[in-house]
Amino acid sequence: MTYVMLVGSDVALLEGLSQSLAGLGHRPSVCASIRDARDACVARPPLVLVVDRALASSAGAELLQLPVAAGGARILYRMASTPPLPLLPALQRVVLADLTLPLERHRLAALCQSVGERAKATGKAPRDTPEGLRAI
């Protein structure tokens, strides 16, 4: 199971994607803003971080500060009716894919699956340890 965080302002789209990813065995989480995502990422870094390109463009370097689990990936998305906004070169280098949703929702699911399998194969998959059993 891959922990996927979806960040964007289109709640209906993200909830639909969340349900689709959950149906495939992933553990999705939805955040409406970069600030909410930062708080959630600090508590538990996602293996896959999926962010609206408009938010990424306006957040700039702040998006680079969101922690991702070891072996994880950042993915950007935009709506088909929205032109792609410019990104910082540093952000362009760390993005695994730039998707047009909902058209490429199957590609998103495949990328989440691939990142999860790669993390398991390399030993970088996050382990779910119950709170009481964690070392200090």
Predicted feature residues:
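Conserved acidic carboxylate
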Residues: 7-8
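Two-component/phosphorelay signaling modules centered on CheY-like receiver
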Residues: 11-30
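Conserved Asp/Asn-Gly motif in the active-site loop of CheY-like receiver
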Residues: 31-35
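Conserved phosphotransfer microenvironments
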Residues: 38, 47-75, 79-87
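Alpha2 helix of the CheY-like receiver
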Residues: 38-39, 109
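As written
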Residues: 90-99
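C-terminal output helix
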Residues: 99, 103-112
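CheY-like receiver
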Residues: 119-136
